[in-house]
Curated annotation (Swiss-Prot):
Species classification: Bacteria, Pseudomonadati, Spirochaetota, Spirochaetia, Leptospirales
Family: Belongs to the purine/pyrimidine phosphoribosyltransferase family. PyrE subfamily.
GO biological process, one term: 'de novo' UMP biosynthetic process
Chain sites annotated for binding orotate: T132, R160
Name of the protein described by the UniProt record: Orotate phosphoribosyltransferase
Length: 185
């Protein structure tokens, strides 16, 4: 990845994303930690999201040795990442479809748990913003696999190094992150 891209992301992570508090934060996993990473400060900001997508497309994804037709994960953390990667590939002349996986099926309309053009998709690169225990990503993987989509690799902005990547590996999903928690303190 371009060091200027990673360096810019790292500075933004330190400035906007990482927080420390003596009073623990409750994480999505249910765990508590004095260290919190709100990656929405990257994924919901146009410039930062654009740089993030370029990092994934230019450096991280080529090293994965994977062909995929779609990119997505559990809403909300994965959504902007999937959209940005999809748009980045489209600008390069390749269609990679973004998929949104709901935590549960809709209670109205078609009742779908996956949104996007997924019915002809065979392979998906799963994405998330932060991996702690891997629970959210595993949920997305299981939903995608239930409809016949093959998922073997995933990417995230930050691995909290709390067993999530290992939990995903037990389900035959190899995660690759841009950053690790230990880089910040």
């Amino acid at each position: 990845m371009s060091h200027s891209h990673r360096d810019a992301l790292f500075q933004w992570m330190k400035t906007y994303v990482y927080r420390h508090s003596e009073t623990p934060f409750r994480l999505a996993s249910g765990l508590e930690s004095q260290h919190y990473f709100n990656c929405k400060e990257i994924t919901l900001h146009p410039e930062r999201l654009s740089i993030l997508a370029e990092c994934f497309i230019e450096e991280i994804i080529p090293k994965l040795n994977i062909e995929f037709q779609a990119v997505g994960g559990l809403t909300l953390g994965a959504d902007p990442i999937a959209y940005a990667i999809s748009l980045g590939y489209q600008k390069r002349g390749k269609n990679v479809f973004p998929l949104v996986v709901r935590k549960e099926s809709k209670g109205h309309g078609t009742g779908q748990q996956i949104e996007g053009f997924w019915k002809d998709i065979k392979t998906c690169l799963v994405v998330d913003d932060v991996i702690t225990t891997g629970g959210s990503t595993l949920k997305a993987v299981k939903v995608l696999r239930e409809v016949g989509i093959n998922v073997t690799k995933g990417i995230c902005i930050l691995d909290r190094e709390e067993g999530g990547s290992e939990n995903l590996q037990t389900e035959n999903v190899t995660m690759t992150s841009i950053f690790a928690k230990s880089e910040f303190f």
